[in-house]
Amino acid sequence: MRIILLGAPGAGKGTQAQFLMEKYGIPQISTGDMLRAAIKAGTALGLQAKAVMDAGQLVSDELIINLVKERVTLEDCKNGFLLDGFPRTIPQADAMKEAGINVDFVLEFDVPDEEIVKRMSGRRVHAGSGRVYHVVFNPPKEEGKDDVTGEALSIRADDEETTVRKRLDIYHQQTEPLVGYYKKEAELGNTRYSKIDGTQQVAEISKQLAVLLG
């Protein structure tokens, strides 16, 4: 079961990734984790990546693809894997295909921008404990204060509305074209593509995914 998750930041991919990992016994492959692990292990690719990053440059698609190729051969990937946050662009998707990394399912989590802004900009955090609230969906007992300590809640920089909108713009420009790419791949019989309504309840989405993936 080799799965790619697509969708804007805040569309609920992370929550469902946890469900899919547990249900199918597959690891989530994150390019950031992969880079850190390769650098820590001192592999040939890790050393290449470290040199590039130390020079303050971006790691090339080719290097990332080679890391993915190496990662999917490990024992924990024998039943499949879950890719979230990669590929981000069509050249990356093409490179993956050329490298022979095939995918069984591409799942797009569809949530309107305004709903994502509401979800993310409404988050409030208690810095000391990491407890997370939401002004609409999970409000604290007293506005702006942590339930346990009574201390003030704050907004993470990532959750500021302007930041959220910037991240959405990048997603629409860079990553959304992959939706069309994978729809076409599905028409050619190379993968299966499904669009999920990400505005539904978490449990409902999990139930749909279980039916869809079997």
UniProtKB/Swiss-Prot annotation:
The keyword Transferase applies. Pfam families: ADK, ADK_lid. Pathway: Purine metabolism; AMP biosynthesis via salvage pathway; AMP from ADP: step 1/1. AMP binds at residues 31, 36, 57-59, 85-88, 92, 156, 167. It is found in: Cytoplasm. GO terms for cellular component: cytoplasm. GO terms for molecular function: adenylate kinase activity; ATP binding. It is an enzyme of class 2 (transferase). GO terms for biological process: AMP salvage. Residues 122-159 are annotated as: LID. Residues 30-59 are annotated as: NMP. ATP binds at residues 10-15, 123, 132-133, 200. NCBIfam families: adk, PRK00279.1-1, PRK00279.1-2, PRK00279.1-3, PRK14527.1. Monomer. PANTHER family: NUCLEOTIDE KINASE. Consists of three domains, a large central CORE domain and two small peripheral domains, NMPbind and LID, which undergo movements during catalysis. The LID domain closes over the site of phosphoryl transfer upon ATP binding. Assembling and dissambling the active center during each catalytic cycle provides an effective means to prevent ATP hydrolysis. Catalyzes the reversible transfer of the terminal phosphate group between ATP and AMP. Plays an important role in cellular energy homeostasis and in adenine nucleotide metabolism. This is Adenylate kinase.
